[in-house]
Regions:
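Charge-dense, helix-prone N-terminal extensions
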Residues: 1-58
Length: 58
């Protein structure tokens, strides 16, 4: 798991619970999308998008 995603999940219990409910394949896709980003701002955007989705905001 990317460090930025792990930190964001640790800081947000609702998103962390959403992460735990996800199937392994979905978790892997979120992690891959973040890891594959070349620019730091892209990684940050993808982490924010994943957290919002896990919170049920998108």
């Amino acid at each position: 798991m990317p460090a930025a995603l792990a930190a964001a999940l640790a800081a947000d219990p609702v998103a962390s619970a959403g992460w735990e409910r996800q199937a392994y394949s979905h978790r892997k896709e979120h992690a891959r999308a973040i890891t594959d980003a070349k620019a730091e701002d892209t990684r940050e955007r993808r982490v924010a998008k994943a957290i919002a989705m896990l919170r049920g905001e998108s």
